[in-house]
């Protein structure tokens, strides 16, 4: 397909360097945070004193090839066991670790630029949540590594998001200020309720208003990315984010739907809490969470609007569309997602170089054929650029937010 515009990939990942979590970490705090351990000749992270098996090889060397599960997610017409696909390894590539090499590869892939998100960083808050201070210590160290190795804006082509948590609201505000000073164009968080020193709280509890108020004022986009959200299977399957290829078997599980359930609950709760009314400059981008949850979420919003007239102050679905951008899975029906959200609220993201990604980002282009040229440009480029552009405003008062 010939394009008359550039393409921006809104979901790329790096693989963390060996010292990503420890370079800026006081070794004395290792037992509470992140350490390395060698068990049976294999290296593992130890998180808060417990060995993590969230990934098979936390060194990422060797690593499965990008998009090796593409055919499986496309429908698995050949009936192959996905564990067999994951055993096709290669040495870690320099573009997974270094921005200069990544920019070169972006050019080879035909991309103008990308948003860059963590791999391990997206799944380490949950195992540490029992110690909120350790969460903050860990991700402060992680973000300092990230700023050193990748920067938050590399040549205007790689925009890397620091990871923030609401485990401590004062820390979150302080870390947000630091990120803004460092030139961050967006921040990334997980779709889950944080555990604080007083227990689990909704991210939209008023105790977190200092953080959301500063986000609202700065006009920076908050990316809510798929993660270990802590979503429970309620006994129908073991909880926890774990991969163990040594078992040699794979079967369907209710856990396969945890990602869409987590983002559904997060965004629905955000809407029901009146968050968009209270913070009218918020921009939320849901990345790598898919889009199948949208019809059910919209149905529930309309139902609640009828049961609580005036609560939202506006049509809640239209309010949602004004504040939320959706990155569908590449296997989602793009035309349907655009019909639900509008072309100006959908962003392309390949998830490269993860195993469930597209082998090459522009393999997505055939999915955009049903769109008009203008809508295609929005999805493939313009919407991402809008999200990466800060939209600062004066502090909103509650009266101003109601107008």
Where are these regions (language model features)?
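Short catalytic/ligand-binding loop motif for oxyanion handling, primarily in non-cytosolic enzymes
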Residues: 15-18, 23, 114-116, 122-128, ...
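Metal-cofactor-binding active-site regions of metalloenzymes
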Residues: 33-174, 331-346
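Conserved small/polar residues in nucleotide/adenosyl-binding loops
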Residues: 396-402
